[in-house]
């Protein structure tokens, strides 16, 4: 196979032999995409009256085809060319200096140009080869002695070595590995010829993957690598299952700032405004599946896992109970044990010291919750059922229902924030909000006076309303708009790939729009902490839920919450006559939100098919000090 230097010799020799000809010559040159294009040869300088031979090269950073035209004569040690664009504009001199036969590279110097470029050349009898163009104003010998920096053949970034058969950077290496390992399917929103360079490589995953393959990255090399150990289990049909990973650019904190609401007169236009916001990059399979070890219940004792979410504290209770064969005195325990069928997983193994302390702290919390369910006779003021004797309907309610201590509602987000917003991070944030909402309810003395069964029944009936009010209150901290937009994009892609039915997508999409509209309306009303607290209390003490006992007492608690709410609004906003009415009219919208869909969106990736109702009793049994220690320990 001829080298590029030999081809250059042939080109110059043919050039000298063609000077005596009077007719232009036509040459066929193979382009990088494998097609053949007929090109009219043009002279490189005015002194030469006949056409010259040319080579076509492609700049990987711009995707632009460039002509290298032979010029001058063959005297001297160096072969000289003219580098021009396709239209012949912006010419610059290129000197073929030498070839490194060991690496199959040809080094060119362009003294007229600025910066360092990297091109590829292809001819009918020579495959694509690596050409480094070195631009410098210094002398040629000085340039050749410099250490040339290898660039990624895909995006032009600084290469870290040869990966999967091609010289690439770490970014393209990781992208190619994830794409091939997980059999990801991408879609190009353009014409499948997007520019892939250091700055725009994340804009189109389809074109980036095609470029990786075209430039020599081998899929077989990835498939031969060791894959993580995993336990087979049924894939959840939930629309936010843990096998999905939502990739969103981290620098866009408020991608929907220009979209004041999801609801417009045209449903299609509101969806398009989300999908075209430029914030959503791609949805890929979860790194949890490939970067963690899924364990079965009989391995819980042997593994020192990183219990990195509050929800895992609760779900681990089932595994702990089953592995140690603890006695079951609560029917809820048998329900939550379904978590041990494969839906509970521990994150990537952390350092031993840190893992041991976290596991110890988590298991201590779980043991306390379990002991409270087994030894209800030993209940104290910390236990929900400690005041179960105060449930008579005739008990007078003394003092205010809510104190200043119930106004504070501070959500601590997981730290550090991951580079990409993934399902695990969303579920962890949502679980913290759910725990905080339930412990807020438990801190109300009147709530504890209802007794264990009634308090659990109330929270089971209204947890979705408390959670939605918490989302609205913490929408800035949680960046709710970004999360909901990610869900919309996920549904859009799932429908395109026939993963979800149109009816299912419509049902979930309507739920998302209702939730977004509710959050937007609360932000527009500038609801303060006291108002949020009273709205939650009114939603919590709702006597119209089926299966409640002492309904009249619950009704009195709701009336008291309303009266205190009215007094506060009247004193704080005396000029806003209709403020109380506007706030109360937002509560019916919460009843329109489907609790099952909320579970799918925010929690299914973490607890699988287990319902929130099953873990509510254990959340309510956690002591406040244990809850706070989990938050502090996992955030530091």
UniProtKB/Swiss-Prot annotation:
<keyword id="KW-0805">Transcription regulation</keyword>
<dbReference type="InterPro" id="IPR000536">
    <property type="entry name" value="Nucl_hrmn_rcpt_lig-bd"/>
</dbReference>
<dbReference type="InterPro" id="IPR035500">
    <property type="entry name" value="NHR-like_dom_sf"/>
</dbReference>
<dbReference type="GO" id="GO:0003700">
    <property type="term" value="F:DNA-binding transcription factor activity"/>
</dbReference>
<keyword id="KW-0010">Activator</keyword>
<dbReference type="GO" id="GO:0000122">
    <property type="term" value="P:negative regulation of transcription by RNA polymerase II"/>
</dbReference>
<dbReference type="InterPro" id="IPR048246">
    <property type="entry name" value="NR2C1/2-like_LBD"/>
</dbReference>
<dbReference type="InterPro" id="IPR050274">
    <property type="entry name" value="Nuclear_hormone_rcpt_NR2"/>
</dbReference>
<dbReference type="InterPro" id="IPR048245">
    <property type="entry name" value="NR2C1/2-like_DBD"/>
</dbReference>
<keyword id="KW-0238">DNA-binding</keyword>
<keyword id="KW-0863">Zinc-finger</keyword>
<dbReference type="GO" id="GO:0005634">
    <property type="term" value="C:nucleus"/>
</dbReference>
<dbReference type="GO" id="GO:0043565">
    <property type="term" value="F:sequence-specific DNA binding"/>
</dbReference>
<comment type="function">
    <text>Orphan nuclear receptor. Binds the IR7 element in the promoter of its own gene in an autoregulatory negative feedback mechanism. Primarily repressor of a broad range of genes. Binds to hormone response elements (HREs) consisting of two 5'-AGGTCA-3' half site direct repeat consensus sequences.</text>
</comment>
<comment type="similarity">
    <text>Belongs to the nuclear hormone receptor family. NR2 subfamily.</text>
</comment>
<feature type="domain" description="NR LBD">
    <location>
        <begin position="382"/>
        <end position="623"/>
    </location>
</feature>
<feature type="zinc finger region" description="NR C4-type">
    <location>
        <begin position="188"/>
        <end position="207"/>
    </location>
</feature>
<dbReference type="InterPro" id="IPR013088">
    <property type="entry name" value="Znf_NHR/GATA"/>
</dbReference>
<feature type="DNA-binding region" description="Nuclear receptor">
    <location>
        <begin position="149"/>
        <end position="224"/>
    </location>
</feature>
<keyword id="KW-0678">Repressor</keyword>
<keyword id="KW-0675">Receptor</keyword>
<dbReference type="GO" id="GO:0003677">
    <property type="term" value="F:DNA binding"/>
</dbReference>
<keyword id="KW-0479">Metal-binding</keyword>
<keyword id="KW-0539">Nucleus</keyword>
<dbReference type="Pfam" id="PF00105">
    <property type="entry name" value="zf-C4"/>
</dbReference>
<dbReference type="InterPro" id="IPR001723">
    <property type="entry name" value="Nuclear_hrmn_rcpt"/>
</dbReference>
<dbReference type="Pfam" id="PF00104">
    <property type="entry name" value="Hormone_recep"/>
</dbReference>
<keyword id="KW-0804">Transcription</keyword>
<protein>
    <recommendedName>
        <fullName>Nuclear receptor subfamily 2 group C member 1</fullName>
    </recommendedName>
</protein>
<dbReference type="GO" id="GO:0045892">
    <property type="term" value="P:negative regulation of DNA-templated transcription"/>
</dbReference>
<dbReference type="InterPro" id="IPR001628">
    <property type="entry name" value="Znf_hrmn_rcpt"/>
</dbReference>
<keyword id="KW-0862">Zinc</keyword>
<feature type="zinc finger region" description="NR C4-type">
    <location>
        <begin position="152"/>
        <end position="172"/>
    </location>
</feature>
<dbReference type="GO" id="GO:0008270">
    <property type="term" value="F:zinc ion binding"/>
</dbReference>
């Amino acid at each position: 196979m001829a080298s590029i230097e030999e081809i250059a010799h042939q080109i110059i020799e043919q050039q000298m032999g063609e000077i005596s000809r009077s007719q232009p010559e036509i040459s066929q040159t193979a382009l990088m995409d494998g097609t053949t294009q007929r090109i009219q040869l043009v002279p490189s300088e005015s002194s030469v009256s006949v056409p010259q031979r040319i080579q076509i090269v492609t700049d990987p950073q711009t995707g632009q085809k460039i002509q290298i035209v032979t010029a001058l004569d063959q005297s001297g040690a160096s072969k000289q060319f003219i580098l021009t664009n396709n239209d012949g504009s912006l010419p610059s001199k290129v000197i073929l200096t030498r070839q490194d036969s060991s690496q199959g590279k040809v080094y060119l110097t362009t003294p007229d140009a600025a910066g360092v470029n990297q091109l590829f050349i292809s001819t009918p009898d020579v495959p694509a080869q690596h050409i480094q163009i070195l631009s410098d104003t210094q002398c040629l010998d000085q340039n050749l002695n410099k250490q040339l920096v290898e660039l990624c053949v895909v995006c032009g970034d600084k290469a870290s070595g040869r990966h999967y058969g091609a010289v690439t950077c770490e970014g393209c290496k990781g992208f190619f590995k994830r794409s091939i390992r997980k059999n990801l399917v991408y879609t190009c929103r353009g014409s499948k010829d997007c520019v892939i360079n250091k700055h725009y490589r994340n804009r189109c995953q389809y074109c980036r993957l095609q470029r990786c393959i075209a430039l020599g990255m081998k899929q077989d090399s990835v498939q031969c690598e060791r894959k993580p150990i995993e336990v087979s289990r049924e894939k959840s049909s939930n629309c936010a299952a843990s096998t999905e990973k939502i990739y969103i650019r981290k620098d866009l904190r408020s991608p929907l700032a220009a979209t004041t609401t999801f609801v417009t007169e045209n449903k299609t236009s509101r969806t398009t405004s989300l999908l075209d916001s430029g914030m959503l990059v791609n949805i890929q399979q979860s790194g949890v599946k490939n970067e963690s070890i899924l364990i079965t219940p009989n391995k819980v004792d042997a593994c020192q896992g990183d219990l990195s979410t509050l929800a895992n504290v609760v779900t681990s209770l089932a595994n702990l109970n089953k592995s140690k064969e603890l006695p079951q005195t609560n029917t809820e325990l048998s329900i939550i044990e379904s978590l041990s069928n494969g839906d509970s997983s521990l994150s990537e193994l952390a350092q031993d010291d840190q893992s041991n302390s976290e596991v110890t702290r988590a298991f201590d919390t779980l043991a306390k919750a379990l002991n409270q369910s087994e030894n209800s006779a030993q209940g104290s003021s910390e236990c929900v059922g400690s005041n179960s004797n105060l449930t008579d309907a005739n008990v007078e309610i003394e003092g205010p229902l809510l104190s200043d201590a119930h106004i504070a509602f501070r959500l601590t987000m997981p730290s550090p924030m991951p580079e990409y917003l993934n399902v695990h991070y969303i579920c962890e944030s949502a679980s913290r909000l759910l725990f905080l909402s339930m412990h807020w309810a438990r801190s109300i003395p009147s709530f504890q006076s209802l007794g264990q069964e009634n308090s659990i029944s109330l929270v089971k009936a209204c947890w979705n309303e408390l959670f939605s009010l918490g989302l609205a209150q913490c929408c800035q901290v949680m960046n709710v708009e970004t999360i909901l937009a990610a869900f919309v994009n996920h549904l859009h892609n799932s429908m395109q790939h026939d993963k979800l039915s149109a009816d299912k997508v419509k049902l979930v999409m309507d739920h998302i729009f209702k939730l977004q509209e509710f959050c937007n309306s609360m932000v527009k009303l500038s609801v303060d902490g006291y108002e949020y607290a009273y709205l939650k209390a009114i939603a919590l003490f709702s006597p119209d839920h089926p299966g409640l006992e002492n309904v009249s007492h619950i009704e009195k608690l709701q009336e008291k919450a309303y009266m205190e709410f009215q007094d506060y609004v009247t004193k704080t906003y005396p000029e806003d006559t209709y403020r109380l009415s506007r706030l109360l009219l937002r509560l019916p919208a919460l009843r329109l939100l489907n609790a099952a869909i909320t579970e799918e969106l925010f929690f299914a990736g973490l607890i699988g098919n287990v319902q929130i109702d099953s873990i509510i009793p254990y959340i309510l049994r956690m002591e406040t000090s244990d809850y706070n220690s989990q938050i502090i320990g996992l955030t530091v």
